[in-house]
Regions:
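Short, surface-exposed acidic-centric catalytic microdomains
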Residues: 23-71
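Extended accessory regions or peripheral subdomains of proteins
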Residues: 2-22, 33
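Short hydrophobic/aromatic beta-strand micro-patches
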Residues: 9, 65-67, 106
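Flexible, gly/pro- and Lys/Arg-enriched active-site loops
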Residues: 48-60, 70-140
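A short linear-motif detector with a strong N-terminal bias
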Residues: 15-22, 37-45, 82-85, 107-110
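Short, structured patches in soluble enzyme cores that scaffold and shape functional sites
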Residues: 10-12, 68, 134
């Protein structure tokens, strides 16, 4: 399979936030047949849609563009494994997270499956995704 462009959003609101982003970038780049092709700047953002008790925990966000020979489902599984390896726990909906890795786009394909919807259904509503896309001159 020829390499495809995968756009991934990284976010962390548990310290050390910058370290979690760096480790996620390293782990993504270490996936088989995958390399980083571009990165946005890192930006601090307010949380969106979180419970009030977590509203003070600002995020560091970054968009990563990768080239990968992996299939979309394998890529997605590996992303979730990276989240788990970096201590992501999903006990509270929209709660604090060491790392959040979202697949925004994968080679322009459209999927609507229970565990994977592409392109990301809320990407265009989120400034922390749209601003870095504009910074890198990428359109969804």
């Amino acid at each position: 399979m020829p390499p495809v462009r995968a756009i991934v959003s990284l976010g962390s609101n548990i310290e050390p936030r910058a370290e979690y982003l760096a480790k996620a970038r390293e782990a993504l780049a270490a996936m088989p047949e995958t390399r980083i092709a571009g990165m946005s700047s890192v930006e601090e953002t307010d949380p969106v849609g979180v419970p009030d008790e977590f509203a003070h925990l600002k995020f560091l966000n970054q968009l990563i563009v990768l080239q990968t020979g992996l299939g979309v489902h394998d890529f997605s599984r590996r992303m979730h494994a990276i989240e788990s390896a970096l201590g992501r726990v999903r006990t509270v909906r929209n709660g604090p997270r060491t790392i959040d890795i979202d697949l925004i786009d994968f080679g322009g394909i459209r999927l609507d499956e229970p565990d994977l919807v592409l392109p990301h259904p809320r990407a265009k509503e989120r400034d922390f995704i749209m601003k870095p896309l504009a910074e890198m001159a990428i359109e969804l």
